[in-house]
């Protein structure tokens, strides 16, 4: 489901960009209908395959990706999704932040690569929320969120690459965290 969720986010992100640039109206109603049908099928696959460890009550980066994917899809289909289902998704997103990150902001999976991926997922999830929802989550988790950013900054080496500690599957959604140039890092 994680891959499906990441694809859904990228589809919506790309669709938004292309829609703004579509002066010739290539993305017509027929395209939109097919796109929305395809996207809705993504939500069904994600919901039917949530990657949560119900036995041990743990959620990892896969479940966080599932929830972020659903948040993006539900935000796009806001009129077609029940208020209860959307709100539960927002609650699960905040719960994932608490379970995925220690109070210090470090990811519990003990991997700098997973920390980068999950921090990216949190950023992407926060972007799609309403300002009220986003502010509430940031206020409730300010220390964690600031800590996750600080730790990510510490994990970037002099060559602007992330220092490898723990597992690494090279996972990424949308590259929100751009590398700083070595010149800029030397100046700091």
Residue ranges and their predicted role:
Residues 110-119, 123-188:
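Extended polysaccharide-engagement surfaces of secreted carbohydrate-active enzymes
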């Amino acid at each position: 489901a994680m891959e499906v969720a990441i694809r859904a986010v990228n589809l919506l992100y790309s669709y938004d960009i292309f829609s703004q640039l579509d002066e010739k109206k290539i993305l017509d109603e027929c395209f939109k209908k097919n796109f929305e049908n395809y996207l809705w099928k993504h939500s069904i696959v994600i919901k039917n395959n949530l990657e949560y460890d119900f036995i041990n009550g743990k959620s990892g980066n896969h479940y966080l990706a599932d929830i972020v994917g659903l948040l993006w899809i539900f935000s796009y289909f806001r009129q077609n999704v029940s208020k209860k289902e959307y709100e539960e998704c927002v609650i699960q997103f905040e719960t994932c932040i608490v379970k995925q990150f220690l109070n210090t902001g470090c990811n519990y999976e003990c991997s700098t690569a997973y920390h980068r991926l999950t921090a990216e997922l949190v950023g992407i999830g926060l972007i799609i929320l309403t300002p009220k929802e986003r502010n509430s989550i940031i206020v409730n988790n300010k220390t964690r969120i600031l800590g996750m950013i600080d730790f990510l900054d510490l994990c970037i080496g002099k060559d602007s690459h992330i220092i490898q500690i723990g597992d690494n599957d090279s996972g990424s959604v949308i590259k929100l965290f751009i590398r700083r140039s070595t010149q800029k890092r030397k100046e700091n």
